[in-house]
Design a protein with these regions (language model features):
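Histidine/acidic-residue-rich catalytic or RNA/ligand-binding cores of hydrolases
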Residues: 59-72, 101-106, 123-132, 149-165, ...
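Divalent metal-coordination and catalytic microenvironments
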Residues: 24, 54, 91, 105, ...
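His/Asp/Glu-enriched, well-ordered alpha-helical/loop segment
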Residues: 81-88, 130-183
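Short, acidic/turn-prone active-site loops that include or flank metal/cofactor-
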Residues: 57, 116-120, 145-147
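Glycine-enriched alpha-helix->loop->beta-strand junction motifs that scaffold or abut catalytic
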Residues: 41-50, 84-87, 104-113, 134-139, ...
Length: 183
C-alpha cells in the first residue's frame, strides 16, 4: 500500500493538469488492501480529488466483499469507512444495491455510472435504474469498454432502455421502464 500511495503522490506532483483532472481509481475492494483504500481516501480528501470505482456489480463480487469486510453491512460501507464516498464519487454498475446502500449513496451524493452493455455481457444483472431515478439517485451512462463493446453513448442509451424494459417485464413490474428523456 505504501509503495502504491507514494507512486501516486509522485505522479500527481509531477503531472500538469491544464486540461484534465486526475481521478483516483481503486479497481474495486477485493483488489485493494484496507491500508491502500484508507490511504486513497486520505489522499482524495487532502487533494480534493474525485474517486471512481465499481460497486455491487454482481452477486459473486458482493459475497466476496462481505467475506473480506465482515464488519460492513453492505458493499458501499467498505468504501465509506475509508472516506472514498466523501469526495465527488462515481460508482460504476450498482446492479444489486440494497435499500440501505442506496440510502448511503444518496446521502453522499454518489453518481452511479450505469453500464448496461457491460452488465449484459458479463451477465451481472439488470440495474434498477428507474427505481434509482425515482428515489433521487444521480445516474449517468457509462460505456465500460473493458466489458462493453462501444463508446457510442447513443447505443448505450438504447441498451439502457432495452434493459429497463426487460427488468420491468421479467423482474419488477412496479417501476416503469426508462424513457428516452430519462436515458
Amino acid at each position: 500500500a505504501a509503495a502504491s500511495l507514494a507512486a501516486t503522490e509522485r505522479w500527481l506532483a509531477s503531472a500538469h493538469f491544464a486540461h484534465t483532472k486526475p481521478i483516483l481509481t481503486p479497481r474495486f475492494v477485493p483488489s485493494c488492501s484496507d491500508a491502500l483504500l484508507q490511504g486513497l481516501g486520505e489522499l482524495a480528501a487532502r487533494r480534493g480529488l474525485p474517486v471512481q470505482s465499481h460497486l455491487s456489480e454482481n452477486l459473486g463480487e458482493i459475497a466476496l466483499v462481505q467475506s473480506l469486510c465482515p464488519q460492513t453491512d453492505f458493499y458501499a460501507e467498505a468504501y465509506d469507512r475509508c472516506g472514498l464516498l466523501s469526495q465527488p464519487c462515481i460508482m460504476a454498475h450498482c446492479v444489486h444495491c440494497p435499500p440501505e446502500e442506496q440510502d448511503l449513496l444518496q446521502a453522499r451524493g454518489v453518481f452511479i455510472a450505469h453500464s448496461p452493455l457491460s452488465n449484459s455481457n458479463l451477465s451481472s444483472g439488470v440495474a434498477p435504474v428507474s427505481a434509482y431515478l425515482a428515489r433521487g439517485l444521480r445516474v449517468g451512462l457509462g460505456s465500460d469498454l473493458a466489458a462493453g463493446e462501444t463508446e457510442n453513448l447513443f447505443r448505450v442509451m438504447a441498451e439502457a432502455i432495452r434493459a429497463s424494459k426487460l427488468r420491468w417485464r421479467l423482474l419488477d413490474d412496479t417501476t416503469a421502464p426508462l424513457t428516452v428523456a430519462q436515458a
